[in-house]
UniProtKB/Swiss-Prot annotation:
UniProt domain CWF21: residue ranges: 27-70
Residues forming coiled coils: none
Organism: Trypanosoma brucei brucei (strain 927/4 GUTat10.1)
GO biological process, one term: mRNA splicing, via spliceosome
Domain of life: Eukaryota
Subcellular location: Cytoplasm; Nucleus
Stated role: Essential protein involved in pre-mRNA cis- and trans-splicing. May function at or prior to the first catalytic step of splicing at the catalytic center of the spliceosome. May do so by stabilizing the catalytic center or the position of the RNA substrate.
Family under the similarity heading: Belongs to the CWC21 family.
Xref: InterPro entries: mRNA_splic_Cwf21_dom
Predominant location: cytoplasm
Sorted UniProt keywords: Cytoplasm, Nucleus
Subunit-level organization: Associates with the NTC complex (or PRP19-associated complex). The NTC complex associates with the spliceosome after the release of the U1 and U4 snRNAs and forms the CWC spliceosome subcomplex reminiscent of a late-stage spliceosome. Associates specifically with U5-containing snRNPs.
Protein name: Pre-mRNA-splicing factor U5-Cwc21
């Protein structure tokens, strides 16, 4: 009697992070393969042209090193941009979660700016008190 174990479909699914990592590894592999293919095609082209093997080996090594260096620089730049983008998104999420209003760095510590805000708030408070007093006086006179 042969029974088949049913796999949990939720366990079969990978997380988005795992998929992104696997996709990155696959892209890395494809890029390295493309570099090797370019070097191989160059080698065949040079052999068909009748160039000596030692010269071909040096040229291919130089080409491979150059292509690999360019790829690594591009990959590093892409990683740096991805990290910066992720940091920006995280900062935006925190800012919205804590209801931080946009402004320049150090606004909260600018004494002149804080003093102007304090004076404006004090003026608004005094105006509100004066309005209430005027309304009371009008009500009292009206009675």
């Amino acid at each position: 009697m042969l029974t088949t174990a049913k796999a949990n479909p939720l366990e079969a699914l990978r997380s988005a992070k795992e998929n992104k990592e696997l996709s990155g590894q696959l892209e890395h592999h494809r890029s390295l393969r493309a570099i090797k293919l370019k070097v191989l095609l160059y080698r065949e082209e040079r052999e068909a042209a009748g160039v000596p093997p030692d010269v071909i080996s040096r040229e291919c090594a130089t080409l491979h090193g150059s292509l690999l260096r360019n790829y690594m620089e591009e990959a590093q730049e892409a990683r740096r941009l991805g990290a910066a983008e992720l940091a920006q998104k995280t900062a935006e999420r925190f800012a919205s979660a804590f209801q931080v209003r946009p402004g320049s760095l150090g606004d909260a510590f600018d004494r002149r700016h804080r003093e102007v805000e304090r004076q404006a708030a004090e003026g608004a408070r005094k105006e509100a008190i004066e309005r209430r007093i005027v309304e009371r006086v009008k009500r009292i006179k009206g009675e």
